[in-house]
Amino acid sequence: MIEWILFVILSFLAADFIAGVFHWWEDSYLDQDTPIFGRLIGGPNQLHHSDQYAFLKGSYWHRNYTTIIPSMLACGACLCFDATQDAWLTFLFLSQANQIHAWGHSKGKNGWLVSMAQRCGILQSCKHHAEHHRSPYHIRYCVMSPMLNPILDAIGFWRYIEYVV
């Protein structure tokens, strides 16, 4: 039982880390004029940073298709190539990264279960995520949980990968 719980937690944190790296990449390198990804991701991401609530106005599918489609393709690849179940579960969690991010902008509108998960520190709270939208704007890229951001921010991870790239 403990092994299963640990497996779920680690898969969730792995998904949060992957989502954080992609979020950093979007913020750092994409805009609406970027070939291929500009219209799908760059433009909406820029809009989100000028109007944090804009992406809440669309449907579930409109808000999440950019994470659902690649995640489901990755899940399919995991099943086809007999990958471990932790990879499959990580991509399943990752498919919901934008939705969990949306909940981080929806204080008082998330229902009791999501609100409780935010209060307990399982899901990222609105207060935690708000730090990403304040100066200096280069912290708190992981959008699913509050667990990884303090560590990654403290060790300068985002500045390090900026240097590497």
Please place each PLM-identified region on the residue numbering.
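Core segments of transmembrane alpha-helices
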Residues: 61-79, 145
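N-terminal Rossmann-like or analogous alpha/beta NTP/dinucleotide-binding catalytic cores
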Residues: 42
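Interfacial segments of alpha-helical transmembrane regions
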Residues: 3-11, 78-94
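Membrane-helix exit/interface motif
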Residues: 49-56, 72-82
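Cytosolic/stromal cytosol-facing helical appendages immediately following the last transmembrane segment
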Residues: 2-5, 21-38, 47-62, 90-165
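Alpha-helical interaction segments
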Residues: 12-14, 118-119
